[in-house]
């Protein structure tokens, strides 16, 4: 399984970005920020590569934005890579 998370330093901003994406009919979710990201407020917005391609530029301009991370889960565990 593979997905993208957008990490912010503010829970409020994470929720606003989530609400924006839902309003744009994008499939997304609020998730706990993985420890491997090493930053953030504890909440991140999870979405697909397609959403990143279409809305990445817009949501990266929100205040307190830390970065995008690729999360891959396999039988061997989870890896987190900063994009």
Task: Report each predicted region and the residues it spans.
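Amphipathic, hydrophobic secondary-structure cores in small proteins
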Residues: 2-5, 9, 17-48
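C-terminal structural segments of small proteins and small subunits
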Residues: 52-83
């Amino acid at each position: 399984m593979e997905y993208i998370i957008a990490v912010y330093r503010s829970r409020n901003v994470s929720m606003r970005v989530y609400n924006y994406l839902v309003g744009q009919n994008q499939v997304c979710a609020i998730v706990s920020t993985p420890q491997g990201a090493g930053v953030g407020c504890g909440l991140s917005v999870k979405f697909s590569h397609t959403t990143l391609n279409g809305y990445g530029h817009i949501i990266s301009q929100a205040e307190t934005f830390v970065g995008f991370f690729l999360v891959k889960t396999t039988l061997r565990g989870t890896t987190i890579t900063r994009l």
